[in-house]
Amino acid sequence: MIGSAAAPGRVPTASPSTPSADPVLLAHQQALGVTTTILLPAGRPVSRPSTHDGVANGLQAEALGNEACQAFAAAHRDAYLFGANEVPDLDDAVATIERQLKRGAVVIGEQKFGVECDAPEMQRLYELAQEYDVPILMHWQFGMYNHGFERFHRMLEKFPRVRFIGHAQTWWGHIDRKHADQTVMYPKGPVTPGGLTDRYLSDYPNMYGDLSAGSGLNALTRDEDFARDFIARHQDKLLFGSDCNDREGGTEKCQGAKTIAAIRRLAGSKAIERKLLYENAKRVFRL
């Protein structure tokens, strides 16, 4: 049962790379105290504009695809689940993702491709997420992945029953109302409240935020006074994820461990901490 370990149960997201990395991933998540991990697959490797001629293959992180994630989860059923993914503008993208959903995938994503967020092919994925009642996780990165962040409210309004999870640099940069230079991926310094991300989380019940990766950690630590208030206001909308590229979980070099420490430092109460590390993910992923 999720959360039955001594440490608070956590539901992070991660991606396996090569089979030889399997023991490393298992040990990494165990060192963090993670009880359930959701693996996010890459789409198939193709060379086309939506993958920046192959740059985005493997989620630009040498991640493997649907079959590898499903197989890993099947081999470790007590602690691993899997997502479903595909390059969205391939003719069989919907069919590929739907096949994985029928096999038990619990999320669509991570969608990390060079397409407009409101393009017809993306809207077909939102419709699929709605049909199967699964969330869709989107990597927002200006100039590279999921274009049109300032228009995304239209999709939130058009698909109110879809649980959207925002992730990555542009998503977290926009906690700041003064985030004007979109090319700055990891902005530093004080945050002015009222940024687009802050408003999406406040105004749309179907919008959630994934605290993983360097972008999530940066958002928590660049202005900790703001972060405390941000967490308090959005305590039911934020989810911990690991998304580490290190090999030694739980050490001072481990990004996931730093994120957990920041959450514990800034949450304000054990009840809020548990929401971010466990309860919100359990609800959003229907576990």
Feature-to-residue mapping (PLM):
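Conserved, mostly hydrophobic/aromatic
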Residues: 29, 69, 100, 108, ...
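Short, flexible/disordered intra-domain loops and linkers
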Residues: 9-11, 17, 44-61, 173-191, ...
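Active-site gating/metal-coordination segments in enzymes
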Residues: 50-145, 213
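Catalytic pocket-lining loop regions of alpha/beta-barrel enzymes
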Residues: 106-107, 115, 119-240
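Mid-to-C-terminal alpha-helical segments outside catalytic/metal-binding sites
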Residues: 1-37, 235-239, 245-287
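Divalent metal-dependent hydrolysis catalytic cores, especially in the metallo-beta-lactamase
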Residues: 10-18, 24-55, 78-85, 105-111
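Generic structural signal for well-ordered alpha-helices
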Residues: 22-26, 66-73, 94-98, 122, ...
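Active-site neighborhood of phospho(di)ester-bond hydrolases with catalytic His/Asp-centered motifs
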Residues: 12-13, 38-41, 83-85, 109, ...
